[in-house]
Each structure stands twice: as C-alpha cells, then as structure tokens.
Amino acid sequence: MTGAQIKEWLEMSAGQFNQIDPNSKEPQQLINSSYPSYNYDVIDGLTYKFDLTQPNKYDREGKLVNQDVSRVRDLAYQGQPIDLNQTFLVVTNNYLTTGNFPGVKDAAEKRLLNLENRQDIIDYIVSEKTINQSADGNWSFLPNIANADIRFASSDNARAHLANQDAISYVGPINTGRICGVPFDC
C-alpha cells in the first residue's frame, strides 16, 4: 500500500469519532454511535493524530462525503512524516482486503493467505509465552479539543482505573442503561 492509501484507511477509521465543536460548552459525545466499531482500526508501526474539529471524510459505508477535509494529522513512520508515494507492506484480514474500505480497496497488490487470525494469535502467544498487552500510544487526538466537555460511555468498572488518568473523569451513570452502540444519554 502507499502512504496515501494508508492515510485514506485512517480517514475511514476516524469515522468512529464525532465531530467536536471546541467552543461549545455543552457535553458532546465522542463516539459516533452510527459507525460500526468493527470498522475502526489502529495501524501499528505508525504514529498519527486525529483532528476531531473536522467532519468525517467518509460515511459509515466508506462513501466519500467530504472530499476536501482531512482528520489525519502528523502521520509518521519511524519518526519521519510519511511520503504519500512510499510503499508499505501491510498485513490485515480478508474483511478489509475484499471489501470497499477506502485506501485498502485501492491497494495495487493483495494476497489472500490461507491463514486464520485466531490461530495466528494463539500460535504467537504459545511461542512467546509472555505477552506485553500495554498499548503503545501511537495515536491520539489533536489537543485543539482539550477544553471541550467530551463524553463517552464505559463500564462502571472502569472507574477503578481512573486514578492515574488526568484527562478522563467519571461524570455519572448512563441514564438508559443500554450499551453496545445503542444511543445513550449521559
């Protein structure tokens, strides 16, 4: 894949998040509840930021809806800005390679290997014996939304993990009690 194709893939993934008005004093929902969460991807080995003040470039189906916008910023590989013509070897699943996902669908070369993701993960865990499960923090949001009241739903059990989080605080239970992509009211 080219750097440009990878950028479009990330533009599609950025649809997971709502557009945020940094000047609003009203609570704003971070997660776009109409976006299928299985279409959100993190691409490891790269670093990047999302500018949530911009609208989504693609709709939930991968249709281009805002051609002249970009949410992907500071896209880099090994600390250097990505050359959009640079080529990368990317390994992903057949859902992405055979679908209509922006960027991925335009890749010049696609090989379907007879491998199953689950078995590959099992084999890796068995061979490594110890797995570092911590996130490497390779992506983030631009700080231009830092003063907005941004909210998202999570399990009440997550409260126990907030002690070391300066940027996240508990604001209360969800009124509807519904989860898993169903609209909610904080």
Name what the model sees in each region.
Residues M1-C186:
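Catalytic centers of hydrolytic enzymes
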